[in-house]
Amino acid sequence: MAQLLGDAEIQSQASKLSGWTLEGSKLQTTRKFKDFIEAIAFVNKLVEPAESAGHHPDIEISYNKVKVTLTTHDAGGLTQKDFDVAATISQIN
């Protein structure tokens, strides 16, 4: 099981991620697109990096908005995997 990060490390890691917020024991970002088709195209781009990392975000789609939430469920909070996947997602347009 992945090691939970302490509060200081979580704050430090989160400060390096533009567009992400801490929501309790979760890391979230919301992206807005021109339309539903672009939103779904973005979601499809998340598949390969999530599979490669073996760490899958929770994804909510609302027409042209996509909310991506990361947490390590089996660890009960945030781990390095969450921040690594968030950094990868941040690079996806």
Curated annotation (Swiss-Prot):
Pfam families recorded for this chain?
Pterin_4a
GO biological process, any: tetrahydrobiopterin biosynthetic process
Q: Which reaction does it catalyse?
A: (4aS,6R)-4a-hydroxy-L-erythro-5,6,7,8-tetrahydrobiopterin = (6R)-L-erythro-6,7-dihydrobiopterin + H2O
E.C. numbers? 4.2.1.96
Keyword check for Lyase: yes
A Gene Ontology molecular function term for this protein is: 4-alpha-hydroxytetrahydrobiopterin dehydratase activity
Keywords for the protein's UniProt record, in alphabetical order: Lyase
Q: What InterPro entries does this protein map onto?
A: PCD_sf, Pterin_deHydtase
- Broad EC category: lyase
Residue stretches spanning the membrane: none
The UniProt family comment states: Belongs to the pterin-4-alpha-carbinolamine dehydratase family.
Q: What is this protein called?
A: Putative pterin-4-alpha-carbinolamine dehydratase
